[in-house]
Amino acid sequence: MKITPIHDNILVSLVESNKEEVSQKGIITALANPDKNESAHKGTVVALGAGPAYGKSEKPKYAFGIGDTIYFKEYSGISFEEEGTKYKIISLEDVLAFEKHGNTKTTTVKKGAKKK
């Protein structure tokens, strides 16, 4: 991934819902069109912006890190797709909640740092 978020923006890969439905006879079928409200507002953190938000002087302090799951407002950010994966870039202001997944890195990307 060559995209690095700036300011207090966050790059997330969207988490798709794997919702299943069970028929009266016990047959499990995956829904062709999962409920948008259950899948479109959740993502895994891929990268964190390192700069301050517009009009602010302090760099953001994230309570979550790369690899954690965040929940965000429905119409926040911009969406795009790369190599079959759906991504979204959102502002820290639009994050509503998060789930920690073990020992994740919560620091920001350092200015001028080279990505592998």
UniProtKB/Swiss-Prot annotation:
Species per Swiss-Prot/TrEMBL record: Mycoplasma pneumoniae (strain ATCC 29342 / M129 / Subtype 1) (Mycoplasmoides pneumoniae)
Disulfide bonds listed in the record: none
SMART domains the record matches: Cpn10
CDD domains: cpn10
NCBIfam families: PRK00364.3-2 (NF001536)
GO MF annotations in UniProt: ATP binding; protein folding chaperone
Keywords carried by this UniProt record: Chaperone, Cytoplasm
Subunit structure, as described in the record: Heptamer of 7 subunits arranged in a ring. Interacts with the chaperonin GroEL.
Main location class: cytoplasm
Localisation: Cytoplasm
Pfam families listed in its UniProt record: Cpn10
GO cellular component: cytoplasm
Name under which the protein is recorded: Co-chaperonin GroES
Signal sequence region: none
SUPFAM superfamilies for this protein: GroES-like
Family matches, as InterPro entries: Chaperonin_GroES, Chaperonin_GroES_sf, GroES-like_sf
Function: Together with the chaperonin GroEL, plays an essential role in assisting protein folding. The GroEL-GroES system forms a nano-cage that allows encapsulation of the non-native substrate proteins and provides a physical environment optimized to promote and accelerate protein folding. GroES binds to the apical surface of the GroEL ring, thereby capping the opening of the GroEL channel.
Residues in coiled coil: none
Similarity comment: family membership: Belongs to the GroES chaperonin family.
